[in-house]
Amino acid sequence: MSEGRNDDQIISGFEKNDLLQHKYTRTLISIIETSFAEKINIQELANRLHLNRSYMSELFSKDTGMSIKSYLTEKRMQRAAIMLQDPNRSVKNVAASCGFEDSLYFSRAFSKYFGISPQQYRRQILKNEKK
C-alpha cells in the first residue's frame, strides 16, 4: 500500500490555494482602487498579476460576487458622485478624473448606474445642501 497524502494534507493544500486566490483578488482590488482614474485594460491587469485573463476574472467573480468591470464601474461611479458635489468641477473634468475619455459616454454610464444624469445629480445634491 503506497503512502499518499492524508486528508489533512489535502485540506491544507486547498486552504493554501484559497489563500493564494484571495491574495490575487485583494491585489487586484488594490490596483483598481489606486488606478481607476486611468484607462484600465483587464488584459493588462492580468499581465501585472501574471494570470490568465479568464482565470483572473473567474477568481475575482468567485471572491466578490461581481465582475471586474462591474467593480471598476462601481468605484468610478462612487468617485464621480463625490466629485460632482463640487459645483466648480465640470462634468467633463469629473469624467476624465474617473477614467472616462468621453464625457458623453460618462454621462450615459452615470445615468445608467444612478438613474439620473450627472447634472441632475449635482442639482439634487446642491439643493439638499441648501435645506
Predicted features and spans:
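Compositionally biased, intrinsically disordered low-complexity segments
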Residues: M1, G13-F14, I32, L49, ...
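Bulky hydrophobic/aromatic packing residues
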Residues: K23-Y24, L45, S54, K75
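Terminal helix-turn-helix DNA-binding modules in bacterial transcription factors
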Residues: S30, T34, K39-Q43, K62-E101, ...
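Append "Primarily bacterial transcriptional regulators
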Residues: Q43-N52, M56, F60, V94-E101, ...
